[in-house]
Each structure stands twice: as C-alpha cells, then as structure tokens.
Amino acid sequence: RSKKNQIIFTSKKVNSDDKVINLIDNFLEEKNSFIFESVEKGKIKGRYTIFGKNPDKIWEFNNQKSYLITENKKIILKDKPEELIEKIIENFKFDTPKNLPKICSLISGYFSYDAIRYIENIPNKCKNDLNLPDVRLMRPRTVIIHDNLKKEIYFIINIFNDEKISNYQKKFEDIKSELFKLSIQSLIKNLDNKTYKEFNNINIKSNTPKN
C-alpha cells in the first residue's frame, strides 16, 4: 500500500528468437503498443528489445494546449505544456530492482520539430497536413524486455502511485494473471500471420492471356 511507484515482474530464459517474434506478432497488434531497440554506437542490434502497451495515461500537447487521455476520455488541462512535461518527468521515479534493466519503467512518445515553439519564438507558418499533436507521451503499464545478451525475457507490470486501488489482494491476483498471459504470448504464434504465409504459398494463375 505504498504511495511509491511499484514494479512487479517475472522472467524466463529463451533459447531462440521464435519467442521474440511471437511477441512482436501478438503484442504489437494492440492499440498504443510500441517496440524499441537499444542500439548504440552504430551497432546493427542492441542488447535490449523493449515492448510496451496498455498506457493508463496519455498526454498530448498541441498549439500550446495540454490534454490528458485516460479511461477513453480526452480532457483539456490548464497546465502549460512545458510545465506539465516537467511535472510528468519529476513524478516518474521508480526504485528499479537490481536484476532488471533501468528501462523497465519508461515514458514513451515523441517530440515533433514544432515543439521547439514552446521555448523559442518561431513563426508557425507550416501547414499541419498530418493532424498530429506536437508532443505525445504515454506511460505504459505493461512492459516486456528481451535481453539479447543474457537470453532472457522480463515481463513487467508497472503500478503508478496515483492509481486508485480499492482491493489490494484482488489487484495482486489480477497482476499475476496478466503476467501469466504475457508469458503465454511469447509461446503462441500469431494465427493471422500464419494465414498470410499460407496465402503466399497458393499457386496463382493469371486469367489474362499474354500477347
């Protein structure tokens, strides 16, 4: 019942890349999911592959306005974008277990080039043809990390200090169930992808004669 941010996790060894491929196929089908590679210094492949999904909060900043998306509702906030971003980062502090990578808890998203206008007086003459916010940040509850060096996968659930929990025992049981389901995702091949492969093997003939 601590007011601190908490990390609950489990892990397992992997002998091949098949489990990671299964995670890519199954995990990334969900909305607001992502994958990162920790590539450094020009290497082709980094040590960690990081998956994230299930954000409880998403912040969007556009035209000097701040928005919060939570529980399928979009709320306009009074905070200035630059001030709110500082608050988000300041409140995002975790005591990371020694056997977990530091990136086990993270805020993910992007800052567009237009975000420079929040701190610099630059004319806004560009056409917004993509209709995307200047900044979009989210804090994923669910994170999976594949350690390519140790050949180990970490399944992680983040519990944030502002989350309202009425029944702690039920919450803990729900988390255990969620961690189990995540581990199963690494074992199951995506059926849709299997279907696509089967279609690729079909012998297709043209019904248009060649001249």
Where do the protein language model's features map onto the residues?
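Extended accessory regions or peripheral subdomains of proteins
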Residues: 1-33, 38-75, 118-211
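Extended, Lys/Arg-enriched charged tracts that mediate electrostatic binding to polyanionic substrates
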Residues: 97, 101-130
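Glycine-rich phosphate-binding loops of NTPases
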Residues: 68, 72-88
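Short HxH-centered metal-ligating active-site micro-motif
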Residues: 83-95, 101-106
